[in-house]
């Protein structure tokens, strides 16, 4: 079943502001929340659809990608945009992205459900890095060194957030639950613990370097292997090279998105290459050979049939791009562009006029065209 338009899901126009999007989301989420629609089996699916729509439209980069490509922008790859000013971005988890909206909507009403103490360790966020390579590098494969700014585990406290690497202790306010309960009229509501900010544990003596966070900002230098055959949109995952986890949690992953630059000679279509080659009017008329460059740095001689016209294509098999996952290489298509002479001398012009008189029967396309024109005019006057 095809996905619905995200703007339609939220009931807003494509020009809706961030505040209008948030207001529409709050209304829809409150209306469709499963806890309030126990008798409606469709509510949960609709609620997830609303969350998905808001997740995309609330983020400027994701929204721009969706406005341009629709749902196809997120098929086969992860969403998320780059941070402003660089080729690097961060993806937080779903719960943190929507916690402000849900808390305002429902007041975290979870009373009576019980629960277990929260783990203080949290996985780090995934990162995105946009990397540009040349077509030649994409053909051969290349090793690239990139500098990635990211949060890394604090060396001073070994990522614990505590001075000297000491262990955190259970929060005395929430007893490690990360939530506190309060009675409001007939309802028991749960809210994030103000003492530990929902972590369930506190650090008595915070590390002086990271101030209790367990991680610090640092630029890392990483070596990345770019395989032969990559194209724009290829995604490379480096496990564990994302943001460091919070207080001893595992690191996220780094996703590298490839962009292949345009080439001065070749245009690319998947594994195939296209090259437009100029030939003289003499070579096109009489036939001959032309030397064309190939992406591997060499060249190939190609025979031009007599009477070739602009646009005629010839194929060099196996001279295209290598397939990313093996299976050989594509082809190179050569398109002829017959050049019209310019800056002619008086003698050259004289010879061309003489040639024209002698070649009235040697231009089949021209004769066919003007025959059609005559038939068209005769039909108009008849």
From Swiss-Prot:
UniProt keyword Cytoplasm, yes or no: yes
CDD domains per the UniProt record, alphabetical: DnaJ (cd06257), DnaJ_C (cd10747), DnaJ_zf (cd10719)
CXXCXGXG motif repeat feature ranges: 154-161, 171-178, 193-200, 207-214
GO cellular component terms, A-Z: cytoplasm
Gene Ontology BP terms: chaperone cofactor-dependent protein refolding; DNA replication; protein refolding; response to heat
Cofactor note: Binds 2 Zn(2+) ions per monomer.
Subcellular location: Cytoplasm
Annotated zinc fingers (CR-type), start-end: 141-219
Binding site for Zn(2+) 2: 171, 174, 193, 196
Family: Belongs to the DnaJ family.
HAMAP family noted in UniProt: DnaJ
Record text about domains: The J domain is necessary and sufficient to stimulate DnaK ATPase activity. Zinc center 1 plays an important role in the autonomous, DnaK-independent chaperone activity of DnaJ. Zinc center 2 is essential for interaction with DnaK and for DnaJ activity.
Name assigned to this protein: Chaperone protein DnaJ
Organism: Cereibacter sphaeroides (strain ATCC 17029 / ATH 2.4.9)
């Amino acid at each position: 079943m095809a996905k619905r338009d995200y703007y339609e899901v939220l009931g807003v126009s494509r020009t809706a502001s961030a505040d209008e999007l948030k207001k529409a989301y709050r209304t829809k989420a409150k209306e469709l929340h499963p806890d309030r629609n126990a008798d409606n089996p469709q509510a949960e699916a609709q609620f997830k659809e609303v969350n998905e729509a808001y997740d995309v439209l609330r983020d400027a980069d994701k929204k721009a990608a969706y406005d341009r490509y629709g749902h196809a922008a997120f098929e086969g790859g992860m969403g998320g945009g780059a941070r402003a000013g660089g080729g690097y971005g961060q993806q937080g988890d779903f719960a943190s992205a929507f916690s402000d909206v849900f808390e305002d909507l429902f007041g975290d009403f979870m009373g009576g459900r019980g629960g277990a103490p929260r783990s203080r360790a949290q996985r780090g966020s995934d990162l995105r890095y946009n990397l540009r390579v040349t077509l030649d590098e994409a053909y051969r494969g290349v090793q690239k060194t990139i500098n990635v700014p990211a949060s890394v585990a604090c060396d001073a406290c070994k990522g614990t957030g505590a001075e000297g690497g000491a262990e955190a202790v259970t929060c005395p306010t929430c007893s490690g639950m990360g939530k506190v309960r309060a009675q409001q009229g007939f309802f028991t509501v749960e809210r994030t613990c103000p003492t530990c900010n929902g972590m369930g544990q506190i650090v008595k003596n915070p590390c002086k370097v990271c101030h209790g966070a367990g991680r610090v900002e640092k630029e890392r230098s990483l070596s990345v292997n770019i395989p032969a055959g990559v194209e724009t949109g290829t995604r490379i995952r480096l496990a564990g090279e994302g943001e460091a986890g919070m207080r001893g949690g595992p690191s996220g992953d780094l996703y590298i998105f490839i962009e292949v630059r345009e080439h001065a000679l070749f245009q690319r279509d998947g594994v195939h290459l296209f090259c437009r080659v100029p030939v003289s009017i003499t070579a096109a008329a009489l036939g001959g050979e032309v030397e064309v460059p190939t992406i591997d740095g060499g060249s190939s001689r190609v025979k031009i049939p007599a009477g070739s016209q602009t646009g005629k294509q010839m194929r060099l098999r196996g001279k295209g791009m290598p397939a990313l996952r093996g299976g050989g290489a594509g082809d190179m298509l050569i398109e002829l562009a017959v050049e019209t002479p310019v800056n002619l001398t008086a003698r050259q012009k004289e010879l061309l006029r003489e040639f024209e008189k002698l070649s009235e029967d040697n231009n089949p396309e021209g004769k066919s065209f003007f025959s059609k024109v005559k038939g068209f005019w005769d039909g108009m006057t008849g």
